[in-house]
Amino acid sequence: MLDFLDYIQFAFSDASKWNRDNSYSQLTMTANALLDFSTPERLKVNLSSLSTPHFATTYTLGTVGLIDGSISYLFTTVPLRDTPSRGTLIPLRKLVPGYRQISAPSLPPGLPTVDGRDGDLAIGDTQGILKKKPTLLHATLHLPPPTTLTGLFLRRLSPTTQLSLAFCSSRASTPKSAPQAALVTQILHDTGKYSSEFLFSTDNALFGFKGLWNFGPDPRKQNQQGDPARESCRPLLSLLSAGAEAYYSPVSSVVGLSTGLRFTTLPAATESPHFTFPYTLTLTLTPLTGSMSTTYSLLASPNVSFSSRFGFNVYSWESEMVAGCELWRRSSNNRLHDDKSQRDSPLFAVDDLTWARRKMGLPDTAPSRNRECDDLPPPRRDNYHHQRSPHASDSVIKVRVDQSWNIRALWEGRVKELLVSAGVALGPTPRSSLSYASSSAAGGVGAAGGLSSYGWKSVGVSVLYSS
């Protein structure tokens, strides 16, 4: 589950119309959400509040074995009046990353097209927001000693450019040593057709570059209204993206290079039934280390997702195989309330899961209508969950397992006014030399030689209360 201030930061990106999906850093975001989720390892309590549309706070306390905490503050120049902040109103799918259905590339708001027309400025007061250059400030103080201070500064420099400054400063371990500090500067550029990112870190003077290119029509070359070419245009059914990243540090002589491909279906772009469920394929290569990784993620139904990953190293011949799934659940009362909310919602007429209901044999209740080609991008899938009933999803169960039988299970849901995460990790654990000698003397050495046993790795619960 996302931290409350991370949720607010994503709301800031949505309010300022910044596309977080069009980035090489997000190439494998769906597989990472389904396979690389973390489970709580102890008891953790979070108290959060969006006290004003511009200011949010979070207080965190962790216990069991080690007592620590943090104090976080966030300020934004963009008013987040439409962002739900109470635990009973926040859509759970906004807090729990899962299968993310990205939309087709679109023109950033305020960016003129090739023919000189302005981009999409008809959504809310986007034009006024961009003129004020949206800014976000975020700072977190981690306690107890050694005290660590982290911060983030975001500023929208133009409709296509965003500046990010992140820093981390830790108190010196000894009075005579200097405190450790690092600053990471990022400049992100997004035109819809492609995106680029320039990075510099004061830690070892690291320079980096990331780029992503989307194959297909260029949203900057949209035809004018009334153009006959618009009559024959068809919405995109899939999207192929290619990207790469490179790093270099002249201080430590570190060089990094990777490249990747992503192919994903775009079911939200059309109402015609598909011959397959939404899926996402990725391929990433790291030539210097000889690593290759492929992922396949599938949205089997509106509430069930599956994902798998296979990694291989051509130098060491080591391999990795991971599989995972997630299941969303709703109580009967909330399901009835949500169905009524969908019928009353204008979004019900453009439901992007109609084709999935047909494939599963469910009644197709969404009225059909002809979608005309226009300059607006297809509606984003996560916007449906924002405008639907706040109780559209009461809980979610995530499970992942790898080839070594390391298993992680996570339950996240709503309990009264609290948002709760409970998880457990199981897997092989190394035995101590004393216990191994005892089991060997007793003739209890297992098939694996007694070098490891299978058991609990961690159990934890995290509780979030927000207002």
Swiss-Prot record:
Transmembrane segments: none annotated. It comes from the Eukaryota. The keyword Transcription does not apply. It is found in: Mitochondrion outer membrane. Residues 361-393 are annotated as: Disordered. Keywords: Membrane, Mitochondrion, Mitochondrion outer membrane, Transmembrane, Transmembrane beta strand. It is a multi-pass membrane protein. InterPro entries: Mdm10. Residues 369-385 have a biased composition (Basic and acidic residues). Component of the ER-mitochondria encounter structure (ERMES) or MDM complex, composed of MMM1, MDM10, MDM12 and MDM34. Associates with the mitochondrial outer membrane sorting assembly machinery SAM(core) complex. Component of the ERMES/MDM complex, which serves as a molecular tether to connect the endoplasmic reticulum and mitochondria. Components of this complex are involved in the control of mitochondrial shape and protein biogenesis and may function in phospholipid exchange. MDM10 is involved in the late assembly steps of the general translocase of the mitochondrial outer membrane (TOM complex). Functions in the TOM40-specific route of the assembly of outer membrane beta-barrel proteins, including the association of TOM40 with the receptor TOM22 and small TOM proteins. Belongs to the MDM10 family. Lacks alpha-helical transmembrane segments, suggesting that it resides in the membrane via beta-sheet conformations similar to those predicted for other outer membrane proteins and porin. This is Mitochondrial distribution and morphology protein 10.
